[in-house]
Amino acid sequence: MALPPNFMPLFRASLIGLGLGCSALALAASAQDAPEAETQAQETQGQAAARAAAADLAAGQDDEPRILEAPAPDARRVYVNDPAHFAAVTQQFVIDGEAGRVIGMIDGGFLPNPVVADDGSFIAHASTVFSRIARGERTDYVEVFDPVTLLPTADIELPDAPRFLVGTYPWMTSLTPDGKTLLFYQFSPAPAVGVVDLEGKAFKRMLDVPDCYHIFPTAPDTFFMHCRDGSLAKVAFGTEGTPEITHTEVFHPEDEFLINHPAYSQKAGRLVWPTYTGKIHQIDLSSGDAKFLPAVEALTEAERADGWRPGGWQQVAYHRALDRIYLLVDQRDEWRHKTASRLLVVLDAKTGERLAKFEMGHEIDSINVSQDEKPLLYALSTGDKTLYIHDAESGEELRSVNQLGHGPQVITTADMG
């Protein structure tokens, strides 16, 4: 359900339904007594919306709730997934990155994995619910949403509860480039990839795969996975039969650890995958085969010796048109690679040249970039429950969106640039 820009109808409905008219009047009176500048400096966005709604109630204005539609999606729409620290019921916030405001929310179950079509035409997630909220019979499902009404257009149950419930890992659930098929990962009882026909609104089958992880689609019937031996597996599948699986060369040794959340541009066919030390592997998958590009170093030898390492949850982002890599870094002890970072480096993906190093001003866990000509850099602080929106060229913080649930972790954008 789409929300109005300032949430006023929802506040009005809540206040009326709970019989809090007197409280609303008192809130309005209190707000009027306080100096405007002081009130605005101290209150959150939610408090400001409540104050405005209470003032409208006191004036007898428009006290009927309304259901609004969100604006049509554009390249600057951003989705923030809040798994709420492994809660059974979760939310995804739909945000207008240009205006810096929440325009809607989508409910999910336990550890949903969101995806969005490159043209912005739909949002989907693979999710899990239980018959008694946090316990009982488990049901896995895929849900598809309209990007304007934010109402579900498909609800597809997955047989035998096959989803891999380990965390909100991007690229454990993926869309094929044509947006017609959703692929999801199964870990137990054996590695497999599930195939869901979004057009037909039906689960199709499970594909047996090697002991490999992540799903990087390159065609409607082909995807790559990363394997334990340091190679990529290419998986070609049809409507039936055994998938055809081939392996690439080993591109990194087993003791050179890659972060859990790489960046992948389907339109460019570019996979960007940093190591724990800041070495960045790049693989060109645009031809349908894997071409390994020269690795680049995000950090200097002196910085690495001084304890600088990548860190965060969603640590790396890639801008297709500019061919730039964005990576969160900070000084940290070894094995602290999932802790938040205070700085970000920008690299030319082709040459490895460092173009910028930004002080983010906050402890940042996850990043992403809009794919338009003058991109926005999205920086999410799980601790602050806030999305900070920066100019990706200068690093300047432009605006922020706060009160994003309990523990927001993952930023998803559409490549509409």
Curated annotation (Swiss-Prot):
A GO MF annotation of the entry reads:
methylamine dehydrogenase (amicyanin) activity
GO CC terms of this entry: periplasmic space
**BP GO annotations:** methylamine metabolic process
The listed locations are:
Periplasm
Enzyme nomenclature, EC number: 1.4.9.1
Q: Which InterPro entries does the protein's record reference?
A: MeN_DH_Hvc, Metamine_DH_Hvc, Quino_amine_DH_bsu, WD40/YVTN_repeat-like_dom_sf
- Domain of life of the native organism: Bacteria
Q: Which reaction does it catalyse?
A: 2 oxidized [amicyanin] + methylamine + H2O = 2 reduced [amicyanin] + formaldehyde + NH4(+) + 2 H(+)
Signal peptide positions (record): 1-28
Alphabetical UniProt keywords = Disulfide bond, Electron transport, Oxidoreductase, Periplasm, Signal, Transport
Cystine residue pairs? 212-227
Q: What family does the entry list?
A: Belongs to the aromatic amine dehydrogenase heavy chain family.
Stored NCBIfam families: TTQ_MADH_Hv
User: Whom does it interact with, and what assembly results?
Assistant: Tetramer of two light and two heavy chains.
Query: What's this protein's function?
Result: Methylamine dehydrogenase carries out the oxidation of methylamine. Electrons are passed from methylamine dehydrogenase to amicyanin.
Q: What is this protein's name? A: Methylamine dehydrogenase heavy chain
- Tell me what organism the protein belongs to: Paracoccus denitrificans
